[in-house]
Amino acid sequence: MVERFDFGVALKKLKEGKKCRRAGWNGKGIFIELQRPDENSKMTHPYIFIDTTGLQTDNPDAPKDRVPWFASQTDMLAEDWECID
């Protein structure tokens, strides 16, 4: 059984280097991750991005990208967060 938790726990796990997703997200194969800038980065602070490059869909026009992510209120209040390998 997959461990599920709230966004506070998900945020803590992101800070530990884990990748997280919501069980309730429609797209399978997508997740969020925390990016910490290094000396070669243009960003100066950590940020969360969503990775949709593994999105499993029959829609050939679906975006498969890595872009900055902002949590919705629904995401922040959800209790179906889980980590992936």
Annotate each language-model stretch with its function.
Residues 1-61:
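Extended non-catalytic interaction/regulatory regions in multidomain proteins
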